[in-house]
């Protein structure tokens, strides 16, 4: 799977973007640098089982073990003490990144109920894309019987693009289904 997206990038996307944006060098063409998958666990931070199940689910989805993110300071209003777990993060690069992107585009997103495409307005000024998913059940690795609660996640696709237009063109060429 990973080879398919790498070949698509080198053989199709690079020449197409080079002509569209008039790049003089193939190293100017934007590429995907990393994909960051983040899940906030919110009020479940007191329960260690929920933190472990989130870690396990993200490891199954991403194919790589995640890291528990902890609070930097105490906030009494949220009943939060310093160094309490507040989320789980996985950063993917290289082959695992391309494998996850392939599964996201071709398996997970088509399984979303009433899916009409993802918004093209979630780009920042540097061409990075952020996507929020409401449930983990869209990934084929997650079995419905094994989860305790439906939780969402945030996926950030970090590119080397300099503008929003370059980032949008790159991700459209990879096959992300924009509206």
Curated annotation (Swiss-Prot):
Purpose of the protein: Binds 5S rRNA, forms part of the central protuberance of the 50S subunit.
Subcellular location(s) of the protein: Plastid, Chloroplast
Primary location group: plastid
InterPro entries xrefs: Ribosomal_uL5, Ribosomal_uL5_bac-type, Ribosomal_uL5_C, Ribosomal_uL5_CS, Ribosomal_uL5_dom_sf, Ribosomal_uL5_N
One GO term describing the cellular component: chloroplast
Family matches, as HAMAP family: Ribosomal_uL5_B (MF_01333_B)
Residue spans crossing the bilayer: none
Molecular function in Gene Ontology: RNA binding; rRNA binding; structural constituent of ribosome
UniProt keyword annotations, A-Z: Chloroplast, Plastid, Ribonucleoprotein, Ribosomal protein, RNA-binding, rRNA-binding
Domain of life: Eukaryota
Gene3D superfamilies for this protein: 3.30.1440.10
Name of the encoding gene: rpl5
Residues making up the signal peptide according to the UniProt record: none
Listed name of the protein: Large ribosomal subunit protein uL5c
Stored Pfam families: Ribosomal_L5, Ribosomal_L5_C
Subunit text: Part of the 50S ribosomal subunit; contacts the 5S rRNA.
PROSITE patterns: RIBOSOMAL_L5
């Amino acid at each position: 799977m990973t080879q398919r997206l790498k070949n698509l990038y080198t053989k199709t996307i690079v020449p197409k973007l080079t002509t569209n944006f008039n790049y003089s060098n193939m190293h100017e063409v934007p590429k995907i640098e990393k994909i960051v998958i983040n899940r906030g666990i919110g009020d479940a931070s007191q329960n260690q089982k929920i933190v472990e199940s989130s870690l396990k689910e993200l490891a199954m989805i991403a194919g790589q073990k995640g890291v528990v993110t902890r609070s930097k300071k105490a906030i009494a209003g949220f009943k939060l003490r310093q160094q309490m777990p507040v989320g789980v993060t996985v950063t993917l690069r290289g082959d695992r990144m391309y494998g996850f992107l392939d599964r996201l585009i071709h398996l997970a997103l088509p399984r979303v109920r009433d899916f009409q495409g993802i918004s093209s307005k979630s780009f920042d000024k540097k061409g990075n894309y952020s996507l929020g998913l409401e449930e983990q059940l869209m990934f084929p690795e997650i079995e419905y019987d094994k989860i305790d609660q439906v939780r969402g996640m945030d996926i950030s696709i970090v590119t080397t693009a300099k503008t929003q237009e370059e980032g949008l063109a790159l991700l459209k060429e990879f096959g992300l289904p924009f509206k």
